[in-house]
Amino acid sequence: MEFISADYSSSDGSDTESESSNKSEVQIEYTEKTCIQKADSTDLPAIPDSIILKYHIPPNLQKYEHQDMNMSRFWRSFTYFEWRPTPAIHRQLQKIICKYKETFMKQEYTNPYQLVDFDPLFISHLGAPKPLHVSLTRSLLFETEEQRHVFIQEMRNGLRNNEITPFKLQICSYPKLYISERANTLYLGLPVSECPNKAQISPFKTIIAEALQKSGISNYQDLIVSRQNLHVSIAIASNPSKATLKRYQQLNETMGALLLLNNDFAYKLEFLVNSIYCDENRHSIRIPFN
């Protein structure tokens, strides 16, 4: 019994010490919280105006006055043929790009035709295949969503009324440089062969013009790409210089003469066109032919 009593007395003593220790910890924690609350409630001195003016950055309101920022209120569309090249065609397109680089992108400082590198548009940076397109219109801006809906519906009606059937579109294998509408980007593209495709392409200009006119677009004639300018962009230039942008027509003349003289690209490129595409912002609507 004495041993049991000794054990119990020892246990009581340790419990007492534990309770006192816990009370002291709680008291310390309470004191710290009280100090923090007092510090938070204390008013800090005001920041001097000189410091505020030194580090203040005013908001850039001018960017909202730029034309591109105001375009967000429009409903966009875009009309084109889509081409999904096969792996064999990919190799031919890559050969065209490499030949262009070899001829016009030498690194000597004396070379007047030195350009920046071109990135292919038919392959992503991860190696996935990407579709190419033949632009039939420029970027279309509608004031209301209803206008865009009318345009796309009239495109359907026009294709049906004209009984458009699938056809093969022939592409020239000799590349040309094309400048973007904003004049800050160069594309390496392949022109659409004009003579063999004249009969198939001509009805689309009328169909698109009527659809734009019925949707309420006044300058619709300026938005349709002419048959002479139809092309497939296969590569894009990375940050070309202003001098290069100014002389891209001269580059085209020189390039055409050299490539035709060497006769490097004797093969023909063509693909089946069985539908037309109209974009709704980032969504593509496919309108198949009859």
Swiss-Prot record:
Pfam families: HVSL. AMP binds at residues 133-135, 223-233. It is found in: Nucleus; Mitochondrion. Disruption phenotype: Lethal. 3'-5' RNA exonuclease that trims the 3' end of oligo(U) tracts of the pre-U6 small nuclear RNA (snRNA) molecule, leading to the formation of a U6 snRNA 3' end-terminated with a 2',3'-cyclic phosphate. In a second step acts as a cyclic phosphodiesterase that hydrolyzes a U6 snRNA 3' end-terminated with a 2',3'-cyclic phosphate to a U6 snRNA 3'-end-terminated with a 3' phosphate. Participates in the U6 snRNA 3' end processing that prevents U6 snRNA degradation. Could be involved in aerobic respiration. Belongs to the 2H phosphoesterase superfamily. USB1 family. This is U6 snRNA phosphodiesterase 1.
